[in-house]
Amino acid sequence: METVGRLCQTPIQEHRPIMAFNRNALQIAAISWLISLLEPNCSPAAQAKIWEDLSGEKALAQVQRLVDFGPRPSGSEAIENSRRYIEDQLRRSGWQVTRQAFTDDTPRGKVQFVNLIAQFSGQGKSAPLFLLCSHYDTKTFDAIKFVGANDGGSSTGLLLELARVIGQHPNLAAKVELVFFDGEEAYDHFSETDGLYGSRYFAKHLGGDRQFRGGIVFDMVGDRSLDVTLPADSPSEMARGIFAAAEALKLRNYFTYLDREMIDDHSPLNAIGIPTIDVIDFDYPWWHTAGDTIDKISAQSLQIVGSVALYYLSEVALKR
């Protein structure tokens, strides 16, 4: 692993000092002066690789904090508590957060939903941005305690860690927008009016001046037995880019194609012309059961997905 902010390895010509007794001091001073001149001109290849800054352990700790709030269905006190926590973490990492609140009809009556939209402090609005998204709600169950460690928790914890890392690289952060969707889960069955409440609302109310070059939706990315399956409806160029990023990091065996399309928060975004890929591991035995608990989540899995995403962002999607 390369050292953060390592210096360019540019040869430095040695000069013999006139006074021998001052030789060491003069050498140190000369080297320090040359380094100060060379540092700003270091090539990007010589800088620390952003994906090496990500910590799966820190992402897992974020998942734990979310799970500690208990079940977090839309409209509940617990989701409001988790919402405040997410906002606080984002602001600590240098992001400005806006609440997009709305009320929608559901099979259980009217429910208030709140999307969280984060842009980096001082971010301009002229260039097209890249979306990084996760839903942070958990499915409503009456008969079981569903804390959604993987389904809702893992992707949100990872996105908070991505926010921390990207926030340390302002030039990259200026090209990214983070969205935490409320209401991804359907109350009965996914349909045009049930499920994906937050992403449908976000897509419908995008202003004409808002331009996005693409997006990634993270969902269920913490399974200890990781097998990320990109849905069949994934934008082909983005899928190739994700696979290439995984290959470059020698993590390709964790990524494959799903043999069918997937209904998820990427669907409304693709429908309005924002190419968005769903990074999801749907092969999860505890999906929508009381067994979706923190012990099923792995820091290594979060590390893998986050590293590939950062490589894809910095070396493929936002290279220029």
What are these model-derived regions, one by one?
Residues 103-105, 214, 223-320:
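Active-site-adjacent substrate-binding region
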